[in-house]
Swiss-Prot record:
One of its GO terms (cellular component) is host cell cytoplasm. It is found in: Host cytoplasm. This is Avian agnoprotein 2b. The keyword tRNA processing does not apply. Keywords: Host cytoplasm, Host-virus interaction, Phosphoprotein. It comes from the Viruses. Residues 89-109 are annotated as: Disordered.
């Protein structure tokens, strides 16, 4: 122990790195989800305002060319939420712990 500082053994350091990496990925996913929910909320608000305007002003049609672009983003977000998501890749930790996997570049030991 140089300078009296304790050193971590390699397996413990690797485990700490994996835990930190998984926590970082989880935080990134949470931020992306919150970002999507924020956009969905804004889009739904735009959709309801457009519908209210169309219903309160009979001279403007909801399907007019000026109103249609306002409806597309919320409808797209609703479709993304309703359609099934593509299959997910296995987690990084499970790929690192399976010894009989082929060489995966930087993940290989």
């Amino acid at each position: 122990m140089p300078n009296g500082t304790p050193t971590l053994n390699r397996p413990l350091a690797r485990l700490a790195l994996r835990i930190t990496s998984c926590a970082h990925q989880g935080l990134e996913r949470l931020i992306r989800l919150l970002h999507l929910l924020l956009h969905l909320g804004r889009s739904l608000l735009d959709l309801f305002q457009t519908l209210r305007t169309a219903l309160t002003q009979p001279s403007t049609s909801i399907f007019s060319l000026t109103r249609l672009p306002l409806l597309l983003p919320p409808l797209r977000l609703l479709l993304l939420l309703l359609l099934p998501s593509p299959p997910r890749q296995p987690a990084l930790a499970s790929r690192l712990t399976q010894p009989n996997r082929p060489n995966r570049g930087r993940l290989a030991k």
